[in-house]
């Protein structure tokens, strides 16, 4: 269950994995695209998980129609704005919305820097209108290779003062982290923090590399840490957080069942893990589902869920004063 007197955070939430079906339909028709279906229920299986996919890459293909309809920068601005509204509707107090501008720009050859600016504008407008706090994390999509990631990083850094961190996401097996060491030197020089998708499709070695060579202070998913007790101890000792996404890990077949998800073991080791959605529109879930449906299936106790909610704020890329302000607001509810 969610404790209302504590801030509720979602730190691992892909903006480009949370494009409403209604918006896909609307923008698809606006730009004259050949969609696989032209009503919401017929379109749903093409853009939302119906049953577990065999792999991460198969899961990610469900995101493709969402970005395919981004025919201009106004469309990018719209989906960013709607993402903030969706977070508000899920009772989230603070969201870190991550996005890949290369992926969003690709279908219609949009300017990457323009996509970044449009997303920044949309999120800022959403925060003003909906009264929640949100920050942005820029993604480099490793799936498209080193050169594409450099283009993506260049675009992201044009708005570096509007971002809190940079992430590396996508095909972890085909494009390992050691190909992106130089990219993350630039991230460090820009004084941005680092979170990396690791230990999802690849093993614990991918997480060590993300921490030691890329500078990750948080890890997205990180389920394979369970294979390496020394890594578990290191995560706990050095306060490196795990952004856990329970339903996503089932739907990508990263974890075989809720019962076998390692988050409970992470908490028992003292690893700071928090609950997040990942790609809510694609998964057909929202953050309350993770606390109220997925977490009990994993076997998390009320005390562990409270700790998870506390961890979410502790791990947020916010100043101490910003965190305290969120605590003060929640305490009055």
Swiss-Prot record:
Keywords: Hydrolase, Metal-binding, Nucleotide metabolism, Zinc. The record marks 221 as: Important for catalytic activity. Disulfide bonds: none annotated. GO terms for cellular component: cytosol. InterPro entries: A_deaminase (IPR028893), A_deaminase_dom (IPR001365), Ado/ade_deaminase (IPR006330), Metal_Hydrolase (IPR032466). Its cofactor is Zn(2+). Pfam families: A_deaminase. Transmembrane segments: none annotated. The active site is at 200 (proton donor). Zn(2+) binds at residues 12, 14, 197, 278. NCBIfam families: aden_deam, PRK09358.1-1. This is Adenosine deaminase.
């Amino acid at each position: 269950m969610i404790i209302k007197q504590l801030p509720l955070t979602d730190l691992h939430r892909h903006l480009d994995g949370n494009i409403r079906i209604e918006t896909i339909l609307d923008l698809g028709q606006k730009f004259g695209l050949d969609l696989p279906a032209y009503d919401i229920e017929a379109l749903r299986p093409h853009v939302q998980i119906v049953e577990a996919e065999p792999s991460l890459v198969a899961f990610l293909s469900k995101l493709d129609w969402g970005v395919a309809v981004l025919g201009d920068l106004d469309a990018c601005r719209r989906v960013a704005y709607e993402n903030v509204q969706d977070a508000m509707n899920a009772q989230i107090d603070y969201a870190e919305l991550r996005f890949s501008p290369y992926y969003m720009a690709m279908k219609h050859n949009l300017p990457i820097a323009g996509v970044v600016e449009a997303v920044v504008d949309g999120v800022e407008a959403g925060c003003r209108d909906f009264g929640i706090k949100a920050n942005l994390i820029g993604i480099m999509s490793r799936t498209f290779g080193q050169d594409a990631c450099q283009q993506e990083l260049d675009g992201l850094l044009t708005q570096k003062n509007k971002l809190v961190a940079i992430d590396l996401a996508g095909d972890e097996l085909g494009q390992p982290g050691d190909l992106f060491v130089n990219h993350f030197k630039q991230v460090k020089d820009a004084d941005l923090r680092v979170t990396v998708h690791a230990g999802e499709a690849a093993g614990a070695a991918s997480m060590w590399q993300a921490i030691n060579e890329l500078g990750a202070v948080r890890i997205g998913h990180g389920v394979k840490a369970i294979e390496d007790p020394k890594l578990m101890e290191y995560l706990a000792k050095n306060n490196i957080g795990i952004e856990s996404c329970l339903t996503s890990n089932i739907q990508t077949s990263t974890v075989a069942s809720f019962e076998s998800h390692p988050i409970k073991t992470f908490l028992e080791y003292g690893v700071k893990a928090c609950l997040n959605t990942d790609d809510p529109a694609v998964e057909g879930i929202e953050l309350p589902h993770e606390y109220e449906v997925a977490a009990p299936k994993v076997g998390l106790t009320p005390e562990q869920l409270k700790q998870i909610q506390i961890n979410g704020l502790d791990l947020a890329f916010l100043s101490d004063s910003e965190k305290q302000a969120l605590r003060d607001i929640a305490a009055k509810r």
